[in-house]
Curated annotation (Swiss-Prot):
It is an enzyme of class 3 (hydrolase). Pfam families: Peptidase_S8. GO terms for molecular function: serine-type endopeptidase activity. Residues 22-311 form the Peptidase S8 domain. The active site is at residues 49, 86, 250. InterPro entries: Peptidase_S8/S53_dom, Peptidase_S8/S53_dom_sf, Peptidase_S8/S53_subtilisin, Peptidase_S8_Asp-AS, Peptidase_S8_His-AS, Peptidase_S8_Ser-AS, Peptidase_S8_subtilisin-rel, Subtilisin_Carlsberg-like. Keywords: Hydrolase, Protease, Serine protease. This is Intracellular alkaline protease. Its EC number is 3.4.21.-. Gene3D superfamilies: Peptidase S8/S53 domain (3.40.50.200).
Length: 321
């Protein structure tokens, strides 16, 4: 039976209280597009991970539901509490609410649906992950709401037809699948390290850089990397209503998931229609800044949400002269 695990990560620090917009949220320029994107309101992101502390003060108002697909808690589906910490951290980066204290996520008015597909020890069966993806796609809220985005900071070393089919099912139903690229890198650009599902072409695979936009030595490098985001020293929500600073591509991926919620709203306003998953990916690529590394390292570049508006503004000013 094939096992999938959390993408390995490093815990740097743990604190009981914070009050800030995390640096990662700032440098991807999320605040620059919050007004135009309604801070992600109306979008639902499925977080497939170790669960979540549902009563965390920064997350409680953003979590609209969840399910447990593991054998933890006796397999009770309604108990999707986090018994690891990883899932709570990921959820906070995606959409921690603006409460006046604590931290703020990339899309602070987007909603979260928690899918516990990893046990407290960070492992999960491949079937749980595939089922979680299909569950997210098929879920409907009381008013017909649907998830448009799935984020997964997990992976395994081997390809799986069942898992790949689940990913393709999601994308064919206009659900974007965001995955951490993996932390098995050797610091070299000319070697490939793959983790699945991030290695599937249909997935948005996310690598990691630090706050100075320097590549870390831990991320996987390969030709399937799509974009990079902050993944070193990321502060977010954690167990016991606290906060932690973690590092890894696990921390980079949720920046992109939150960004997609903002981009979907921006695109709908700009195009006056709902864009397909492929079109949304194209809009994401438009907001990637080249940072001087090979495509194996950084894909299309660094996530820069305010890039399009900044360029548009420059041309608008030129046109007025």
């Amino acid at each position: 039976m094939r096992k999938f695990r959390l993408i390995p990560y490093k815990q740097v620090d743990k604190v009981s209280a914070l009050s800030e917009v995390p640096m990662g949220v700032e440098i991807v320029e999320a605040p620059a597009v919050w007004k135009a994107s309604a801070k992600g309101a109306g979008q639902i992101i499925g977080v497939i991970d170790t669960g979540c502390q549902v009563d965390h003060p920064d997350l409680a108002e953003r979590i609209i539901g969840g399910v447990n697909l593991t054998t933890d808690y006796g397999g009770v589906e309604t108990n999707f509490s986090d018994n690891n910490g990883h899932g709570t951290h990921v959820a906070g980066t995606v959409a921690a609410a603006e409460t006046g204290s604590g931290v703020v996520g990339v899309a602070p008015k987007a909603d979260l649906f928690i899918i516990k597909a990893l046990s407290g020890d960070g492992s999960g069966e491949m079937g749980w992950i595939a089922k979680a993806i299909r569950y997210a796609v098929d879920w409907r809220g009381p008013k017909g709401e649907q998830m448009r985005i799935i984020t997964m900071s997990l992976g395994g070393p081997t390809d799986s037809e069942e898992l790949h089919d689940a990913v393709k099912y999601a994308v064919s139903n206009n659900v974007s699948v965001v995955c951490a690229a993996g932390n098995e890198g050797d610091g070299r650009e000319d070697t490939n390290e793959f983790a699945y599902p991030a290695a599937y072409n249909e997935v948005i695979a996310v690598g990691a850089v630090d706050f100075d936009l320097r590549l870390s030595d831990f991320p996987n490098t390969n030709e399937e990397i799509d974009i990079v985001a902050p993944g070193v020293g990321i502060k977010s929500t954690y167990l016991d209503s606290g906060y932690a600073e973690l590092s890894g591509t696990s921390m980079a991926a949720p920046h992109v998931a939150g960004a997609l919620a903002l981009i979907i709203n921006l695109a709908k306003d700009a195009f006056k229609r709902t864009l397909s998953e492929t079109e949304i990916c194209a809009q994401l690529v438009r907001r990637a800044t080249p940072i001087g590394f090979t495509a194996q390292d950084k894909g299309n570049g660094f996530l820069t949400l305010g890039l399009v508006e900044r360029i548009t503004g420059q041309f608008t000013e030129k046109g007025k002269k």
